[in-house]
C-alpha cells in the first residue's frame, strides 16, 4: 500500500472533521469549536475540537487523531498475533454530541483506519466505524429517519450490509450490567478489509458523510420544543448510562486508557453534567417509561411507517 493511499485517507478524515464542525456550529448558532492540537511522544498527534455551552449543544467534541509506532502494545496483539513485530498507523475521526435539550438525542460517530506494516510482507489493514443514537425521550419518526438514512447509505454496498451492521451496533452498544441498550443503535463495523481497499474506503466515507444527514434533521425538528426541570433531571440520569458504557465496556476507551493515549481526548465523550439515582423507576405510562418499553428493546425500524 502506497504512502499516497494512506495520505488520501488522512485527507478525507481531516476534511470530514472540518465539515462536521462547521455544520454543527451553524446548527448551534451561538458557540464555536475551540481547537487543541497535540502531539504524541511515540509518534503522531491530532487535533481535538470542543464546543461548549452552546444554545443547542451543551457540549460537542470532534476529534481527529493520527498515531503511529514501531510496535504495537501486547494488549493489541494478544488476539491478533499476525500484528506482532509490525509498525503501525491508526487514524480516525470520533465525535460525541451532548445536546442541551432532553428532546434531542445524544449521538456518537466515528470512522477509522488502521495499518500495520513489516518489511517484505503484505500490510495488514482495516477500516472501522459507525454511528449510533441515544435518545432520552423517544420519537418514532426520528428513529425511523435515523435507520432509513443508515439503510440508504449502505444500499450501494449490498443488501446485507445494513442488517449486518445494524445488528452489530445493537450487540455492541449494550450495557451488560444493566441488561439494556445504550440507545436505538445505528451502524457499527470493524475489521473491514474485503472485498478490496477502494470499496472499504468508499463505504467508510459514506458512513462518515452520512452522519449529519441522519442527525441534523432530528436536531432541527426538536430544538424548539420546550422542556423543564423534570425532563432535564431524566436527561442527566440517562447520561449516567452513557458514562457507564464508555468506562466499563467501550473497547476504544479502554484501549486508549490502557495504552497511554491522550486522556483529555479519550474522555472527550463524557457529558459535562450527569447524575445517578438509586433504584430509579419511571412512572407507569409516562414518557420516561416509554423509552424503556418502546425504544431501548431491539426493533426493526425499517418496518415502521416514515
Curated annotation (Swiss-Prot):
Name of the top EC class for this enzyme: oxidoreductase
A GO term for molecular function: metal ion binding
Localization in the cell: Cytoplasm
Keyword Metal-binding: yes
Major location (coarse): cytoplasm
Positions contributing to substrate binding: 94, 110-112, 260-262
NCBIfam families: PRK05330.1
Annotated protein name in UniProt: Oxygen-dependent coproporphyrinogen-III oxidase
Native source species: Serratia proteamaculans (strain 568)
Taxonomic path: Bacteria, Pseudomonadati, Pseudomonadota, Gammaproteobacteria, Enterobacterales
Gene giving rise to this polypeptide: hemF
Amino acid at each position: 500500500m502506497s504512502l499516497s493511499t494512506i495520505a488520501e485517507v488522512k485527507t478525507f478524515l481531516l476534511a470530514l472533521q472540518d465539515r462536521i464542525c462547521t455544520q454543527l456550529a451553524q446548527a448551534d448558532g451561538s458557540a464555536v469549536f475551540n481547537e487543541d492540537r497535540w502531539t504524541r511522544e511515540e509518534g503522531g498527534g491530532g487535533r481535538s475540537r470542543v464546543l461548549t455551552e452552546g444554545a443547542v449543544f451543551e457540549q460537542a467534541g470532534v476529534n481527529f487523531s493520527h498515531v503511529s509506532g514501531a510496535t504495537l502494545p501486547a494488549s493489541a496483539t494478544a488476539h491478533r498475533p499476525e500484528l506482532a513485530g509490525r509498525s503501525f498507523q491508526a487514524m480516525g475521526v470520533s465525535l460525541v454530541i451532548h445536546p442541551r435539550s432532553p428532546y434531542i438525542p445524544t449521538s456518537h460517530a466515528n470512522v477509522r483506519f488502521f495499518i500495520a506494516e513489516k518489511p517484505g510482507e503484505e500490510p495488514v489493514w482495516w477500516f472501522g466505524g459507525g454511528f449510533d443514537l441515544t435518545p432520552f425521550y423517544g420519537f418514532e419518526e426520528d428513529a425511523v429517519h435515523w435507520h432509513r438514512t443508515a439503510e440508504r447509505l449502505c444500499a450501494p454496498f449490498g443488501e446485507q450490509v445494513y442488517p449486518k451492521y445494524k445488528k452489530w451496533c445493537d450487540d455492541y452498544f449494550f450495557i451488560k450490567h444493566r441488561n439494556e441498550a445504550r440507545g436505538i443503535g445505528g451502524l457499527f463495523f470493524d475489521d473491514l478489509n474485503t472485498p478490496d481497499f477502494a470499496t472499504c474506503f468508499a463505504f467508510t466515507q459514506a458512513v462518515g458523510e452520512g452522519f449529519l444527514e441522519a442527525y441534523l434533521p432530528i436536531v432541527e425538528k426538536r430544538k424548539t420544543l420546550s422542556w423543564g426541570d423534570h425532563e432535564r433531571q431524566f436527561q442527566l440520569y440517562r447520561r449516567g448510562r452513557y458514562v457507564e458504557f464508555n468506562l466499563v465496556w467501550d473497547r476504544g476507551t479502554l484501549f486508549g486508557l490502557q495504552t497511554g493515549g491522550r486522556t483529555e481526548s479519550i474522555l472527550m465523550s463524557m457529558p459535562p453534567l450527569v447524575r445517578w439515582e438509586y433504584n430509579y423507576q419511571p412512572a407507569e405510562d409516562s414518557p420516561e417509561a416509554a423509552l424503556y418499553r418502546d425504544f431501548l428493546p431491539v426493533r426493526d425500524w425499517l418496518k415502521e411507517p416514515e
